[in-house]
């Protein structure tokens, strides 16, 4: 396959932080299309190991000498200006390319679908890819999470379409000039970058209005801010979806069960026509995932995917790593790992957990970033209603300095003030298994929530619970 975005032979492209989920996907696509790729990261990971096997040169640790011989440097917002590789790149006058700019270059080569929204981007991107695959369109995919069906977050397809996750966190998603845009929802998030919610809303409107006159945007009419945006967007075609009776692609008769969600869909475009799908199966729990599936259905129908392929693609959807992923069952207690770290995401995940749990729902939360906890504190205090017990860990700083009065203790106090009946602070990760063992009984579901290293706790917990059960003792603090 020859999809080189420039007409020249260039040397190695160096990625600073190549193991990151967004960076690794772009690097993989470039490797698979014949580029020389190298990069550095602070520590080895599954992503760096995969890229190395594909031919990338990987450096562990950041050092100025790593960029010797590089043609250009790709970086993300997470990379600080004083990173030695960035300093050396500027000294050598190498092109410094933002991650979104490099993704935009790859998107230029195909018709593109960019999936945006405050929440649900990764899952929706994966669902769009799955249905297009089922319909024989074989898309290229660059996602913000590991797609279980691929075992990776990126895939080079032979078809005309590329499906990408559009990350709004630093505003650079506006560089992605897509043929098709998706907006799942718009909530207050990344206010450290945008300053206020009005700027967030304006960015998503610009994202939609970036599409060409022949493209379209699929937007979720269930979300009030998205619905309000539809009134402001001019000269661009919108396809609405949701459970809202006014949506053109809408779900009804939604049922949750052990196998996931079952629902029916009616498609009624405003210019006429009627299509219905009865009793679709999505092997994921939660109404929010039904909404994500509706986005994928809306896009697929516009691209001509058959109803049968849509049905098969959804039924076979294998999910995304860290999106309601079961890590094990110990003594009848199911342990689930989820990336949810915003109050809206947490509430949706816990509602899904409540729908499928045979017993209690126990939430373990590791707040992600002090600024997010501070800016959305009241929302955090109100988003755990579907959890019978909430266990609160220390904040995962993600490079931020602590903020006085913002942390584990304040969230515990806030949850209790908001009326939550059982909230427990986690003294240390080593004590989690003992605490869960005291709370959980067969049939209960324990969901670990956060974007930090809590995922490692989720994978360790089933074994630790089994060990405690076998020994009859308590975990060491």
Swiss-Prot record:
GO MF terms listed in the record are: ATP binding; UDP-N-acetylmuramate-L-alanine ligase activity
Q: What broad class describes the main subcellular location of this protein?
A: cytoplasm
Gene3D superfamilies, per database record: Mur ligase, C-terminal domain (3.90.190.20), Mur-like, catalytic domain (3.40.1190.10), NAD(P)-binding Rossmann-like Domain (3.40.50.720)
Q: Which domain of life is it from?
A: Bacteria
Keyword Kinase in record: no
> Acetylation: is it a keyword of this entry?
no
InterPro entries for this protein: Mur-like_cat_sf, Mur_ligase_C, Mur_ligase_C_dom_sf, Mur_ligase_cen, Mur_ligase_N, MurCDEF_pg_biosynth, UDP-N-AcMur_Ala_ligase_MurC
Binding positions for ATP per the UniProt entry:
117-123
Enumerate the subcellular locations listed in this protein's record, separating them with semicolons: Cytoplasm
Q: Name one GO cellular component term.
A: cytoplasm
The family assignment reads: Belongs to the MurCDEF family.
What this chain does, per the entry, is described as: Cell wall formation.
Q: Which HAMAP family match?
A: MurC
Supply the PANTHER family for this chain: UDP-N-ACETYLMURAMATE--L-ALANINE LIGASE (PTHR43445:SF3), UDP-N-ACETYLMURAMATE--L-ALANINE LIGASE-RELATED (PTHR43445)
What is the name listed in the Swiss-Prot or TrEMBL entry for this protein? UDP-N-acetylmuramate--L-alanine ligase
Protein encoded by which gene: murC
